[in-house]
């Protein structure tokens, strides 16, 4: 009897084990089919064809205007979305960064073949998730399957290896065919006149017409120490720049004596102090010259940077706050006014007596200069190297295409103005700000005249635009500070065009609070990392030129040399965003 019972129990257990094995086999088969579905969608979306050559490819809105005046179509609709991006997460963008994924495949052929068409990938993921939810264990069982995420990563990196291999083969073929050819250059811009009043952005008319003037422009004595209200700022300001901001009026009203404009300090934590003074903060004094009510309990202010200052951190009383983040606490400190030393040109220091009158006669200037050189022990190259006039002329030639006609004549003001309009690297900006010698500052600027620079995304290092495509939509130059309705201050760089496939769009275009009257703005994102990098401005009024241009946010881009350019810089971030998107859809 016992033997019969044992055999019965064993047969039942064997049947149960067979059922479990069959279920596991079906479950594993479903997981394999789901992963195969992703792989098939991936392979369908990413055909095996040569990568595009590493050359500058630009969209040119000016050419479109010339062909009929129609506005250009959106370059990219299917922006790679970051699951951390949500409304309000980017106060700098003025709008929500959420935008629906594109279901249109019409632009897939226009994308680089190593990028991820989001609509196809999402459809595969949605199918896989919907199937997993109907099975025992749901999404958790799918994620805990054998090497599921490892297989997805392997799929991604196999495509990356193929992209790298085809890219190297293409580069080798091009090098073998044309070994002596120089690297490809960007297509030249057609000549265009600015059909826009550049005084309007400089007046910051988006604040409204109810601002009142605050008289008083006070330059403080060099080397003097003053006790004043201080703030922090995420951009480096140079004397002469306008800083618009929106803040609680109680921060200033008690400190504003009568009708005299208030002077306060703005320091820059990004500006690293010299190694011998690690406990110093550098900044500028700013003076308010206009104010007006915003109607929301805040006050609009316009201020102008006047002089460089240095702050000893031990003298700060309170906790300094960023001026762009609606500070609520006052912070005071002692500040010291830094000097600006300028030595005249070597030949102008030579006393030529009565012959000096020939210096100002245009027809005699060259002869007079040659005569001066013959009477000095300095070689002509040394005199030319430190010639203020030669630096001004070379800067004028370099900025000729940017339609700027407001170059100051004072050497001190000119040195700061050139830093803002020539777009130096962060290292060079630091050096030019910290030096007290105007001559040294001009020499540093001169050393960058031959450099070709680009705008790179600060988050993923992908290329966005050429600095040679900068132009002035404001009388203050190509770089201007603007304030959005939330009080966030943007350092905006205006360019004619951006590199093709470098950006996507978010949200809907709007004309509200436009920094350029007559233009609508539309948020643009980096195509690779989906971070906010600026705005597209498109004319909504007739007879405005250019019809389309772009404003790059200084907090989202950096300046780098053209030698850093690579059309594949953002690949790592594409992979990261894809894996994050899969994980978020499965939760």
From Swiss-Prot:
GO molecular function: metal ion binding
UniProt KW keywords: Metal-binding, Nucleus, Ubl conjugation, Ubl conjugation pathway, Zinc
Biased composition (Acidic residues): 75-85, 170-181
Region named Disordered: 1-113, 158-195
Highest taxon of the lineage: Eukaryota
Residues annotated for Zn(2+) binding in this entry: 457, 460, 526, 529
A Pfam family of this chain: Yippee-Mis18
Cellular localisation: Nucleus
Basic and acidic residues compositional bias, start-end: 159-168
Pro residues bias locations: 182-191
Ranges of biased composition (kind: Polar residues): 22-31, 86-96
Annotated ranges, domain CULT: 452-561
GO biological process: positive regulation of neuromuscular synaptic transmission; positive regulation of Wnt signaling pathway; protein ubiquitination
Record domain Lon N-terminal: where: 227-453
UniProt PTM comment: Ubiquitinated.
InterPro entries per record: CULT (IPR034750), Lon_prtase_N (IPR003111), Yippee/Mis18/Cereblon (IPR004910)
Main localisation: nucleus
Pathway given in the UniProt record: Protein modification; protein ubiquitination
CC per GO annotation: nucleus
Subunit and interaction comment: Likely a component of a DCX (DDB1-CUL4-X-box) protein ligase complex. May interact with pic/DDB1.
Family: Belongs to the CRBN family.
Entry function: Substrate recognition component of a DCX (DDB1-CUL4-X-box) E3 protein ligase complex that mediates the ubiquitination and subsequent proteasomal degradation of target proteins. Has an essential role in mediating growth by negatively regulating insulin signaling. It also has a role in maintaining presynaptic function in the neuromuscular junction synapses of third-instar larvae.
Protein name per UniProt: Protein cereblon
Natural source organism: Drosophila sechellia
Lineage start: Eukaryota, Metazoa, Ecdysozoa, Arthropoda, Hexapoda
């Amino acid at each position: 009897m016992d033997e019969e019972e044992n055999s019965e129990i064993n047969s039942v257990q064997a049947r149960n084990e067979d059922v479990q094995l069959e279920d596991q086999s079906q479950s594993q088969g479903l997981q394999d089919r789901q992963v195969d579905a992703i792989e098939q969608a991936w392979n369908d979306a990413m055909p095996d064809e040569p990568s595009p050559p590493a050359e500058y490819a630009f969209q040119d809105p000016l050419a479109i205007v010339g062909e009929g005046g129609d506005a250009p179509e959106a370059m990219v609709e299917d922006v790679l979305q970051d699951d951390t991006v949500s409304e309000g997460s980017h106060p700098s963008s003025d709008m929500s960064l959420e935008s629906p994924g594109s279901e249109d495949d019409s632009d897939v052929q226009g994308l680089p073949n190593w990028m991820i068409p989001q609509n196809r990938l999402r459809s595969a993921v949605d199918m896989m998730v919907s199937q997993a939810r109907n099975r025992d264990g749901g999404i958790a069982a799918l994620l805990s399957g054998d090497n599921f995420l490892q297989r997805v990563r392997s799929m991604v990196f196999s495509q990356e290896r193929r992209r790298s291999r085809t890219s190297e083969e293409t580069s080798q073929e091009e090098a073998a065919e044309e070994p002596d050819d120089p690297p490809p250059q960007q297509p030249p811009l057609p000549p265009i006149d600015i059909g826009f009043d550049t005084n309007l952005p400089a007046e910051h008319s988006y604040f409204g017409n109810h601002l009142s003037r605050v008289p008083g422009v006070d330059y403080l004595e060099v080397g003097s120490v003053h006790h004043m209200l201080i703030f922090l700022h995420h951009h480096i300001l140079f004397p002469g720049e306008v800083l618009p901001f929106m803040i609680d009026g109680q921060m200033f009203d008690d400190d504003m004596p009568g009708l005299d404009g208030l002077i306060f300090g703005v320091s820059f934590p990004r500006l690293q102090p010299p190694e011998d003074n690690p406990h110093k903060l550098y900044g500028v004094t700013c003076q308010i010259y206009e104010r007006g009510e915003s109607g929301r309990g805040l006050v609009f202010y316009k201020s102008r940077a006047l002089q460089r200052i240095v702050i000893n951190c031990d003298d700060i009383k309170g906790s300094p706050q960023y001026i762009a983040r609606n500070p609520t606490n006052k912070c005071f400190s002692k500040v010291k006014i830094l000097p600006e030393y300028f030595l005249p040109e070597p030949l102008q220091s030579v006393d030529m007596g009565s012959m000096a009158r020939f210096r100002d006669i245009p027809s005699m200037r060259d002869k007079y200069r040659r005569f001066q050189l013959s009477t000095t022990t300095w070689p002509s190259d040394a005199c030319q190297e430190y010639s203020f006039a030669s630096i001004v002329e070379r800067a004028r030639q370099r900025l000729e295409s940017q339609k700027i006609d407001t170059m100051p004549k004072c050497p001190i003001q000119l040195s700061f103005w050139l830093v803002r309009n020539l777009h130096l690297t962060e290292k060079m900006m630091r050096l030019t700000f910290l030096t007290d010698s105007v001559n040294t500052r001009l020499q540093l600027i001169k050393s960058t005249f031959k450099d070709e620079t680009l705008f790179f995304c600060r988050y993923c290092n992908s290329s966005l635009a050429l600095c040679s495509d900068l132009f002035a939509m404001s009388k203050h130059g190509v770089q201007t500070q603007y304030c959005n309705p939330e009080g966030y201050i943007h350092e905006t760089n205006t360019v004619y065009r951006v590199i093709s496939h470098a950006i996507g769009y978010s949200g809907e275009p709007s004309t509200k609070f436009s920094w350029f009257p007559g233009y609508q703005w539309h948020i643009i994102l980096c195509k690779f990392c989906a971070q906010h990098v600026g705005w597209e401005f498109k004319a909504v009024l007739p007879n405005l030129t250019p019809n389309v241009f772009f404003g790059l946010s200084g907090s989202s881009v950096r300046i780098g040399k053209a030698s850093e350019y690579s059309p594949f810089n953002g690949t790592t971030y594409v992979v990261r965003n894809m894996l994050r998107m899969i994980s978020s859809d499965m939760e």
